[in-house]
Amino acid sequence: FINKHASLLPSYKGLMPYFWTKIDNAENGVTFHLVNKKIDNGKIIYQKKIKTKFNSMIEFYLDVYDKFPVYFLKALKNLKQKKFIKSEINKSYYSIPNRKDYSNFLKKKGKVILFSNFFKIYKLVKV
């Protein structure tokens, strides 16, 4: 199995990576990796740094999923060629944020969703 994780693994393993990268002023990105018994710990088959600054968590994920087909095809190509990525990034793991974490997120001008995001989402799901 292949998993998509919205951070540059092995940093920010676990839940809500955008949230934690915002608090730490860290680089955003996406990683495709093979699934194993440990959380977000399998061999990395594709990584992409995302340099765009986003106004909300939803904008980040909309961007990631918009480009998902391109990223996924590159991951499959690397897997077929048995091309694995060795990352020199420090390992970290995060779980569910508490009130203090959320307060820090807001201090960093973090937003989960903006009112304008509702229109983008509506356009995507409109039938």
Predicted ranges, named:
Residues 1-101, 105-113:
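Donor/substrate-binding cores of folate-linked one-carbon enzymes
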Residues 118, 124-127:
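C-terminal accessory region of SF2 helicases/translocases
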Residues 113, 120-121:
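N-terminal targeting/leader regions
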